[in-house]
Design a protein with these regions (language model features):
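Glycosyltransferase donor-sugar binding loop
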Residues: 2, 25-40, 54-56
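Conserved acidic donor-binding segment of nucleotide-sugar-dependent glycosyltransferases
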Residues: 110-121, 129-134
């Protein structure tokens, strides 16, 4: 998973999932100032099973390589504003399991472009099904979602809204003409 090491991101459930799946390697990328981590979360991290690695903060290229090398992306966050890391995982073609929360309604569809889960046991079942090949591969549909929600696609949608509202500013030349006369 990727995110701050806090309970809201689903860290306790992530660790419980690792306990239930001891033969699977779990990686968590992200960092939070230890002063901001509640004691119970800090203790859970200190007592994490051996199959869990906290990689901390990594550069963009290392994170991309981690996404591309993953067999499954399990994002157990309880609350999100958009789910950027989900889009990153989908763009990298990783089978993805997310918590079934309202922010994903309408664009992430269970069994169509991702798998959704509402409990640690449901996550275990979906992750196991993906690793064993028992669940259908949704990576191409997931990639399409990432493309549809790319910055370029979102910018074009915003431009269309402005155009329909007749508030699109007049186009400016790409390279404004410069005054050739110099003093």
């Amino acid at each position: 998973s990727v995110g701050h090491t806090i309970a809201r991101k689903g860290l306790p459930e992530f660790l419980e999932l690792a306990v239930r799946m001891p033969d699977v390697r779990f990686l968590w990328f992200g960092w939070t100032d230890p002063c901001l981590i509640p004691q119970e979360v800090r203790q859970a991290m200190e007592q994490a099973p051996e199959n869990v690695t906290f990689a901390g903060f990594v550069d963009r290229e290392t994170l991309r390589e981690a996404y591309c090398g993953a067999d499954v992306f399990a994002f157990m966050s309880h609350e999100e504003t958009e789910g950027i890391v989900v889009l990153e995982a989908l763009a990298c073609g990783i089978p993805t399991v997310v918590r079934d929360i309202p922010v994903y309604a309408g664009w992430l569809r269970d069994g169509k472009n991702v798998y959704k889960a509402d409990s640690t046991e449901a996550f275990r079942q979906r992750v196991t099904g993906l690793l064993d090949g028992a669940l259908p591969d949704l990576t191409e549909a997931g990639r399409r979602v990432a493309e549809e929600r790319s910055m370029a696609a979102m910018g074009e949608q915003l431009r269309e809204i402005y155009r329909r509202m007749d508030i699109l500013p007049a186009a400016r030349p790409a390279h404004p003409q410069r005054n050739q006369a110099r003093a």
